[in-house]
């Protein structure tokens, strides 16, 4: 519950912070930051050495393992920070951005704080003190947001975003170590860490594939279209990605935990129902936001962000479909078939880079449409390819998503009719959004009433269930027999 509440607050904080920072900075500064951040983010994928995902399974009495992990992470963090800062020199020269080196150097310090957080975070997870980690995360994000706004207000530009990134990881590291620091012994054994490194390697490979692709994307867009368009592209991409993935994180975690311990037939049912619930929440929000993008950008961000509109209209619905289709990934992780997810992500990253490359002939709008097409192919792959392993077949999932998708399209149409009739001022925009939500609700009741009742019943059972280590035995409504 604590993690879910913190996740919700962070989403709200990001949604409030995005327009404020966009107003204060503008596309040029966001474009410069977009060149710097993927470099550090890519290297950051190595910062926990694969230990973050597995160290919590180790008994705290195993001092050799915990001490070895601490020293390995310290060495890794310092080494990666130096390598990142050095690479910043090369990237700054290639991108012809003299400020880029300093910003990457500041961001590189966060790598040390990331590694300092891994061991105490694992100890807290093992002790099931997840609330402490959630509180530290929330505190760090609030302080980071305040510092970013203050610096941006004083004209610090892209430095304010870099400072926010660094402060978040620094505050989080300090708070986690205050809660669970244990002085390591002066011992080290690589053999003691071997199985932890092997287990975490697959997830690191997936993250590297994704971030490397985005780094190449940003570099190509900067070279072909300039920093201003890169800033708008990155902002639209970031808003869409953060909003949709943040909404899906809790569902991802629930599927992973249940797949580790639950019966496979029940996991199939849970996957189908949670995908539907995610679609019910995301489809109207993203479709309406895409329809209202011209008014939202004009009213909240101003004319200098006018190029952002098209990116939001494409990326918001696309990412909504993507996060729903990716809910097979936690089941693959639990079943030991993460390799399927890796190859799908690798194909997506390669396809996105090729789509951006076509922008040389098609323009940036054509490249963005190509990215959307590649992402939809990825969605189909994530539904089809894992089906034999997970038992989660495509047609039942699509049947559950049809109602929310159709209703979301009708809601968007309702919004557009209201705005076209009454104008594009803020009153008409609010009326259009309200009308769209009403249209969505009525459409769902008309075409999907029975499923809505079952969704409510299942959601109420999951939420009201007391905390337990035992998996839920059935995810069907209590008044009907289990069926796929």
Give the role of each language-model region.
Residues 12, 71-96, 101-106, 146-154, ...:
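Alpha-helical transmembrane segments of multi-pass membrane transport and lipid-handling proteins
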Residues 14, 44-63, 125-126, 236, ...:
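Helix-loop junctions and terminal segments of transmembrane helices
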Residues 54-63, 112-136, 159, 180, ...:
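Membrane-interface junctions at transmembrane-helix termini in multi-pass inner-membrane proteins
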Residues 101-108, 136-182, 198-201, 235-237, ...:
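Hydrophobic alpha-helical transmembrane segments
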Residues 131, 135, 174-215, 254-269, ...:
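Interhelical loop/hinge segments that connect adjacent transmembrane helices in multipass membrane
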Residues 384-387, 392, 413-484:
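Membrane-proximal transmembrane or re-entrant/amphipathic helices at the cytosolic face
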């Amino acid at each position: 519950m604590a993690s879910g509440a913190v996740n919700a607050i962070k989403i709200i904080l990001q949604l409030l912070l995005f327009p404020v920072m966009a107003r204060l900075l503008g596309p040029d500064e966001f474009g410069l930051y977009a060149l710097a951040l993927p470099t550090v983010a890519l290297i950051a994928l190595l910062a926990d050495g694969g230990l973050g995902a597995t160290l919590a399974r180790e008994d705290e009495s195993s001092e050799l393992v915990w001490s070895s992990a601490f020293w390995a992470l310290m060495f890794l963090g310092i080494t990666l920070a130096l390598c990142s800062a050095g690479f910043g020199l090369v990237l700054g020269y290639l991108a012809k951005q003299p400020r880029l080196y300093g910003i990457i150097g500041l961001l590189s310090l966060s790598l040390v704080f990331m590694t300092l957080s891994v061991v105490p975070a694992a100890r807290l997870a093992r002790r099931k003190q997840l609330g402490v980690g959630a509180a530290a995360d929330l505190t760090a994000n609030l302080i980071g947001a305040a510092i970013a706004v203050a610096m941006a207000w004083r004209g610090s530009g892209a430095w304010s975003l870099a400072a926010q990134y660094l402060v978040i990881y620094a505050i989080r590291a300090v708070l986690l170590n205050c809660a669970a620091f244990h002085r390591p012994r002066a011992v080290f054994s690589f053999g003691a860490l071997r199985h932890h490194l092997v287990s975490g390697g697959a997830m690191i490979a997936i993250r590297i594939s994704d971030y490397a692709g985005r780094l190449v994307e940003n570099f190509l867009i900067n070279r072909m279209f300039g920093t201003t368009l890169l800033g708008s592209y990155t902002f639209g991409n970031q808003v869409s990605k953060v909003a949709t993935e943040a909404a899906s994180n809790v569902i991802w975690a629930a599927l992973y935990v249940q797949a580790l311990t639950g019966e496979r037939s029940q996991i199939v049912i849970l996957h189908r129902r949670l995908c539907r619930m995610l679609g019910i929440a995301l489809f109207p929000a993203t479709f309406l936001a895409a329809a209202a993008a011209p008014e939202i950008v004009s009213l909240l961000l101003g004319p200098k962000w006018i190029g952002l509109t098209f990116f939001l209209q494409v990326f918001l619905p696309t990412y909504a479909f993507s996060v729903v289709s990716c809910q097979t990934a936690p089941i693959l992780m639990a079943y030991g078939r993460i390799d399927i997810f890796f190859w799908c992500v690798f194909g997506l990253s390669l396809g996105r880079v090729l789509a951006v490359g076509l922008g040389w002939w098609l323009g940036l709008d054509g490249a963005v449409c190509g990215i959307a097409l590649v992402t939809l192919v990825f969605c189909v792959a994530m539904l089809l390819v894992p089906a034999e392993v997970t038992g989660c077949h495509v047609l039942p999932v699509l049947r559950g998503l049809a109602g929310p998708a159709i209703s979301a399209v009708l809601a968007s149409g309702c919004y557009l009719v209201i705005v076209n009739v009454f104008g594009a001022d803020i009153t008409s925009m609010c009326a259009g959004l309200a009308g769209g939500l009403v249209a969505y609700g009525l459409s769902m009741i008309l075409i999907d009433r029975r499923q809505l009742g079952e969704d409510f019943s299942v959601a109420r059972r999951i939420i009201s269930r007391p905390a337990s280590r035992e998996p839920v035995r059935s995810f069907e409504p209590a008044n009907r027999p289990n069926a796929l």
